[in-house]
């Protein structure tokens, strides 16, 4: 199936952030079989998975991977998906039935280059709240993975499944259920939900999704360490966000921490908003979240947020004042009441405030 067809027929049915964050840098090819578990938001009859071999945004200091880096050539031997159940101890049952997925009719694929790719549709007949086990087997030296994924991930080693993150994961779990609105959230670890417990789905994007009509789909494109200036390059990551009808944009923290000035951040946000509008989509622009930012960066934090609340925000379709919702009272507005990466309590408060605005 072509990616263009994927976007026509499929929309996100999982609110967990799942991305291409870092490239492995193995000296020689390695064999890996990995598993990751996802919870489905609404269920559906047919599904397909979307992948990319290109890094979405710069990881940490950039020494391992920067935005738009492309993975090497690697062999994808198999991808399987099956419905399973989460046990009280947090582990998962073995799926009774695994579906072996295909890529243009073939069960294997040689992956190379920067173009996204997807599986063919497969029947799943899933219900809302069902969990799925995603399993991939591959051989390669340089391929993407999600280091800060907030989902349970494992590798098969000597017959045992051990915690492990270094294997590719889908950037969307797509369902062909009928939806009336596609809502996307692009941002950093705060958007991804890195301050919440693994596999809890208590991050604010998930809590917003829970309060929206069932006919809406929600796609969390948040990634740890992400920068607005990477999204402003207008490559694969922002291109995915622009497949949504409404794009929520939440950047600034990592830009400030990496030395970006207020004027640079403002210019990047203008670029992002304009690009989304050129695609014919709506934008909800967030103020820069509260964080433990000191020195000159703190001054820039106030300047950028003043601009977002003013003329910059006027270029968007709406503004959500995230900073005011989670920030401390003056003079410490730049610090969060609910930890720098919002915990579950803070995420629920943010979600409630967002839903109360009735943006759409």
Predicted segment positions?
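Catalytic His-Asp segment of secreted/periplasmic serine-dependent ester chemistry enzymes
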Residues: 290-360
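A short helix->loop->beta-strand "cap" motif at the edges of active sites that frequently abuts
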Residues: 279-283
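N-terminal secretory targeting modules
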Residues: 1-186, 191-192, 196-198
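Conserved acidic residues
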Residues: 130, 245, 317
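Hydrophobic positions in alpha-helices of CheY-like receiver
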Residues: 272-276
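Conserved SGNH/GDSL esterase-like catalytic core that processes O-acyl groups on lipids
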Residues: 180-271, 292-302, 336-342
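Alpha/beta-hydrolase-fold catalytic nucleophile elbow
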Residues: 250, 286-287
């Amino acid at each position: 199936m072509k990616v263009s067809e994927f976007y026509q027929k499929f929309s996100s049915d999982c609110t967990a952030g799942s991305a291409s964050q870092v490239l492995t840098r193995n000296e020689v090819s390695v064999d890996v079989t990995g598993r990751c578990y996802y919870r489905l938001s609404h269920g559906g009859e047919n599904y397909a998975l979307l992948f990319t071999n290109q890094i979405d945004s710069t990881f940490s200091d950039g020494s391992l991977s920067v935005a738009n880096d492309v993975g090497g050539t690697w062999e994808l031997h198999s991808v399987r998906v099956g419905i399973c159940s989460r046990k009280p101890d947090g582990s998962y049952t073995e799926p009774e039935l695994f579906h072996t997925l295909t890529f243009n009719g073939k069960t294997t694929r040689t992956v190379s280059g920067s173009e996204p790719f997807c599986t063919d549709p497969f029947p799943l007949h899933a219900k809302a709240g069902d969990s799925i086990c995603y399993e991939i087997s591959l051989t390669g030296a340089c391929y993407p993975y999600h280091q800060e994924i907030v989902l349970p991930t494992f590798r098969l080693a000597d017959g045992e499944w051990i915690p492990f993150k270094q294997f590719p994961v889908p950037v969307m779990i797509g369902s062909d259920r009928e939806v009336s609105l596609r809502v996307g959230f692009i941002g950093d670890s705060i958007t991804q939900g890195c301050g919440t417990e693994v596999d809890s789905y208590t991050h604010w994007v998930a809590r917003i999704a829970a309060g929206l009509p069932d006919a809406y789909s929600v796609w969390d494109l948040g990634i740890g360490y992400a920068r607005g200036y990477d999204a402003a390059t207008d490559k694969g990551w922002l291109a995915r966000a622009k497949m949504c009808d409404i794009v929520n944009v939440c950047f600034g923290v990592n830009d400030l921490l990496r030395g970006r000035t207020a004027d640079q951040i403002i210019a990047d946000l203008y670029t992002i908003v304009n690009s989304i509008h050129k695609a014919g989509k709506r934008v909800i622009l967030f103020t820069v979240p509260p964080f433990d930012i000191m020195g000159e960066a703190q001054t820039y934090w106030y300047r950028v947020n003043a601009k977002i609340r003013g003329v910059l925000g006027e270029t968007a379709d709406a503004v959500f004042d995230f900073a005011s919702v989670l920030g401390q009272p003056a003079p410490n507005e730049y610090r969060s009441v609910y930890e720098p990466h919002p915990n579950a309590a803070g995420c629920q408060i943010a979600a409630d405030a967002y839903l109360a605005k009735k943006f759409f």
